[in-house]
Swiss-Prot record:
Organism: Treponema denticola (strain ATCC 35405 / DSM 14222 / CIP 103919 / JCM 8153 / KCTC 15104)
Main location: membrane
Other noteworthy facts: Bacitracin is thought to be involved in the inhibition of peptidoglycan synthesis by sequestering undecaprenyl diphosphate, thereby reducing the pool of lipid carrier available.
GO biological process, one term: regulation of cell shape
Family under the similarity heading: Belongs to the UppP family.
Catalytic reactions of this protein: di-trans,octa-cis-undecaprenyl diphosphate + H2O = di-trans,octa-cis-undecaprenyl phosphate + phosphate + H(+)
Function as written in the Swiss-Prot or TrEMBL entry: Catalyzes the dephosphorylation of undecaprenyl diphosphate (UPP). Confers resistance to bacitracin.
Membrane-crossing segments per the record: 1-21, 39-59, 86-106, 112-132, 144-164, 184-204, 210-230, 249-269
EC category name: hydrolase
A cellular component annotation (GO) from this entry: plasma membrane
Entry EC number(s): 3.6.1.27
Domain of life: Bacteria
Protein's name according to its UniProt entry: Undecaprenyl-diphosphatase
Amino acid sequence: MSIFQAIILGAVQGLAEFLPISSSGHLAIVEYFFKQEDLPILFDILLHVATLAAVCTVFAKRIAGLFSVLGRFIIRKSKPEDKDDLMMIAAIIVATAVTGVIGLLLKDWVKTIDIRLIPIFFIITGLLLIASSKIKHNKQAKNVTLLTAAITGLAQGIGVIPGISRSGSTISASLFAGLDREKAGEFSFLLSIPAILAAFILEIKSADNLLAGVSPISLISGMISAFVVGYFSLRFLLKLIKNGKLMYFAFYLIPLGLGLSIYFWGFAG
């Protein structure tokens, strides 16, 4: 893998991991056109580490606050104002458990998915973003309930399918469940932390030759690219969520899905 390819793949990961356009779908398409259909396992793992670092950087204060609340709860010194944060922690645990079950059920199928299906899932993601942008609640919830957590965890599990955006599906699910926009965005990205960690652990365990096909400079270049692009992508997306503009990504995903469908089904065999 060249340094240029590493930077491009890192940028794609950084953009698509957070923007509601499906990182796995875009990486699969980029790898296909780069004629590199087996991404080196260590490179893939470290791209996830870089995007995890980006989300932890953006939400550093919030994460520290949640750990502080959890610490007080463990030593039985919780404060009355900790109630909402304790519910957030419980919601993350519930959602992650649901995600794990769905992810395990879909794991083998996702590994062998026909690349021609990915554009169809891009279109589905686009339609989901349009539908969620039309939601108008008279009174949107400011706090995550366990039911909302379970629904959002289900959506995140389905988001392992290439072409189905994890962030798009989780934010949309939270909105459908009645959560307000800012809280839906926050919950989605806090929920991504255990999901990315789990993916990291699974990939490490299943790896045979971590160093195959990639040089140290390519690894570093890809990681830096993924972190920088991911950081600014996440900041940008949080502003769009606040303003209810997620629907804009549908105007990219639907034409992309249609164009790739025509290519794969009509010209690529």
